[in-house]
A protein has these predicted regions:
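Short His-Asn-centered micro-motif
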Residues: 160, 193-195, 273-281, 306-309, ...
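Conserved AMP-binding/adenylate-forming
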Residues: 302, 310-413
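Ser/Thr-glycine-rich phosphate-binding loops at phosphate-binding pockets of nucleotides
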Residues: 145-155, 344-347, 403
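Conserved ATP-binding/catalytic segment of the ANL
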Residues: 388-455
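Adenylate-forming
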Residues: 282-297
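Long, K/E/R/D-enriched contiguous segments that form extended
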Residues: 269, 298-299
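Nucleotide 5′-phosphate-binding alpha/beta core
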Residues: 1-147, 154-205, 217-249, 253-274, ...
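Short, aromatic/basic amphipathic alpha-helical patches
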Residues: 201-216, 289, 318-325
Length: 455
């Protein structure tokens, strides 16, 4: 078996383009790029690194983002007040709903400039430009603006500079490759169960770009341009929405057939394969296989990393555990090789389940996770509350955010010996919060009538 150090060294060689210049690493980047195993940094060392990372990011946004500085002044907090990790609860948190409160047209560009830390590049906005037109103009000028969670008809827009986005892409790749050790190797085949990163501004697709550098041959489930207005139209229950859904339904049947044929080919050849992305797509593939009495036994040659979206239909959820058992039964992929990942468009820290107990491990060298009650106070260990985080990697927008997700957090994993805090395996939306996440959004757009039920 390959040594872990050699394994990560090979990964870094493949992902070289994502590295910032070594003489200009921020403290958060040091915690991600320099750590050999981001989930096994000793607690004292991780705490010191995280303090430096969050303090640096907070000072940066306080000094360079006038909107956030005003927010801090309203809360009577300055960077000088953050003297230790114990002071992190003083850092003002931005509600995730804030990133949905934008106007359209030229005012949308001005809203992005308000959220953005630093100076946005200048672009020319035309009268008929939609959100994607404006985003693409900014992205051509050097940014990587992406969006998610249009499930209420309002997307979450996050403006990243290229460096912050590269940090996010590297972080997600390193977190996954570390957790599946020793499974990963470049000479293998992958299937991305998300939109093509190079044809969409949907975050969950776009952030998977490193998959194409880490694995030699990748196929994409949704290999077409996917724009904000199409997603919104498909979710509306009018004639246009129904026509779009009907066209997508026909395309989805072909998509399932393509994935099954791909599996047959690589199973026959004894190839190593991986799936990354929305679980509901693979769920429908497995349903089709089971219906036809077809089973595979990929064993250690197969791995699955899912990203949220555990509603299969509007009236049916599947549990993470149920999904793992189904993958083991139909694809022959061991449950240890079937991991879930938790992340969001607003953040650059990604939590991946450990193979031993399937708890979500938090990358604690650059990312402070918190669980808070309705009054903004931290709850006791293991109690349910809202997930909030301080993201040291976010340099182009203030990544100090309270989400609408309900979680339980523990200081250490009850099953494995990795020294990071963990979240319980299932993350749910808090009562009164809309269903969020790119996988849920893709389900709403694409899963309509794929075997029953309505989205």
């Amino acid at each position: 078996m390959v040594e872990f150090k050699e394994y990560i060294s090979e990964m870094n060689r493949r992902l070289k383009k994502y590295f910032p210049e070594s003489n200009s690493l921020t403290p958060a980047e040091e915690g991600v790029f320099k750590a050999l195993d981001i989930f096994r940094v000793p607690k004292k060392e991780a705490d010191e690194q995280r303090y430096k990372a969050i303090k640096y990011a907070f000072k940066h946004h306080y000094e360079n983002n006038s909107f956030y500085r005003k927010f801090c002044k309203e809360n009577n907090v300055t960077p000088d007040d953050i003297k230790s990790i114990k002071d992190f609860n003083k850092i003002p948190l931005v509600p995730d709903q804030f990133f949905k409160t934008y106007p359209s047209g030229k005012e949308f560009a001005m809203w992005l400039a308000t959220v953005y830390t630093g100076d946005l590049p200048s672009i020319v906005v035309k009268r008929n430009d939609d959100y994607d037109d404006i985003i693409n103009k900014f992205n051509e000028a050097g940014l990587v603006i992406s969006y998610s969670s249009g499930t209420s008809g309002r997307h979450t827009f996050i403006p990243r500079d290229k460096r912050t986005f590269y940090d996010a892409e590297y972080m997600i790749a390193k977190a996954v490759i570390t957790m599946v050790y020793p499974f990963w190797e470049y000479d293998s085949y992958g299937y991305l169960l998300m939109p093509n990163p190079f044809k969409t501004n949907v975050f969950a697709g776009k952030v998977c770009g490193a998959y194409f550098d880490a694995v030699k041959d990748i196929q994409v489930a949704m290999d077409r341009e996917l724009k904000a207005d199409l997603i919104q139209a498909a979710m509306k229950n009018n004639l246009k929405g129904r026509i779009i859904r009907y066209a997508m339904q026909r395309e989805n049947k072909k998509m399932i057939d393509r994935i099954i044929n791909w599996m047959r080919e690589h199973y026959k050849n004894g190839d190593k394969i991986s799936f990354i992305g929305a679980p509901f797509i693979l769920y429908f593939v497995m349903e089709e296989l089971e219906k036809n009495g077809e089973y595979f036994d990929f064993g250690e040659n197969g791995a699955i990393v899912t990203g949220g979206g555990w509603k299969i239909f509007e009236d049916r959820r599947i549990s993470v555990e149920e999904f793992r058992k189904k993958a083991e039964k139909i694809l022959g992929i061991p449950q240890e090789n079937c991991l879930d990942l938790y992340g969001m468009v607003e953040g650059n820290g990604f939590m991946v389940q450990c193979p031993e107990g399937h708890y979500l491990h938090i990358p604690n060298t650059c990312y402070q996770a918190m669980v808070i009650d309705e009054n903004g106070e931290e709850v006791a260990e293991g109690e349910k509350g809202r997930f909030a985080f301080l993201d040291g990697l976010a340099m182009s927008y203030p990544g100090f955010i309270i989400s609408g997700d309900e979680v339980r957090m523990y200081e250490e994993c009850p099953v494995c010996d990795r020294p990071t805090p963990v979240l319980e395996p299932e993350v749910k939306r808090a009562a009164g919060s809309e269903m969020r996440g790119c996988a849920e959004e893709m389900r709403r757009v694409l899963a309509m009538d794929m075997g029953g039920g309505n989205a």
